[in-house]
Design a protein with these regions (language model features):
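Active-site-adjacent loops and short helices of periplasmic peptidoglycan-processing enzymes
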Residues: 1-81, 88-91
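Domain-terminus/edge residues, biased toward the C-terminal soluble/receptor-binding domains
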Residues: 58-61, 69-205
Length: 205
């Protein structure tokens, strides 16, 4: 939470940073009510579900803005991965916020100023994205990391402790960069071979 008061006037960028770094449920509600067609969080959830489907989130139904457990509120692991990549590609101006390790809004609650992503600062290229926890889903993490120009996205869910989440996430990142390499087979426009054509204008292409 950002520990917002009903009379606070907060810049949108501060609210976005509060959501990303501090997991600010109150900031989610403020933005949701501002964007909602009817000024309610429920109205925003309907809008978010519709927009999500347009983005390819076909297994997601939202009932609130912050992911708090609610009847009918659900999102698949696959959809989380799709959304993670969309955030990176469609909003490059905001993505660096996911790598911020601390944020103190207006000097409030310094004990709640640290990003909960356990991978940040480990020197493995991690720069996002978001942690989560519910009783049903356990501890989870939507993560991203980049090394030598190659980026990976991954989604973890169902871990039983904070420590398990941190260990599993670091293991996955190290494994992904160690086990896979990028190979360039050809450049655009270059000829890599010929294929025969039957009954065509040319004998091959």
């Amino acid at each position: 939470t950002m520990f917002l008061n009903p009379t606070d006037r907060v810049a949108v960028l501060d609210l976005i940073r509060g959501i990303i770094v501090l997991s600010g449920n109150d900031a989610c509600a403020v933005i949701a009510e501002a964007l909602s067609p009817d000024g309610t969080e429920a109205g925003f959830a309907k809008l978010m579900t519709k927009r999500g489907y347009q983005l390819g989130l076909t297994n997601s139904t939202f009932k609130n803005s912050n992911g708090w457990p609610a009847d009918g509120h659900q999102m698949s692991v696959r959809d989380l991965g799709i959304l993670a990549e969309k955030l990176f590609t469609d909003f490059p101006e905001y993505y660096p916020m996911f790598a911020e390790q601390t944020y103190e809004f207006d000097g409030r609650a310094p004990a709640n100023s640290r990003n909960r992503n356990p991978l940040l600062g480990l020197g493995i290229g991690a720069d996002g994205l978001k942690t989560g926890h519910t009783m049903d889903a356990g501890y989870g993490l939507v993560g991203s990391a980049q090394q030598d120009g190659r980026r990976i996205f991954f989604v973890l869910s169902g871990l039983t402790t904070l420590e398990d989440r941190a260990q599993e996430a670091e293991t996955i990142v190290n494994w992904a960069f160690r086990q896979f390499v990028v190979e360039k087979f050809a450049s655009g426009g270059s000829e890599i071979g010929k294929a025969k054509v039957w009954n065509g204008k040319s004998r091959d292409v």
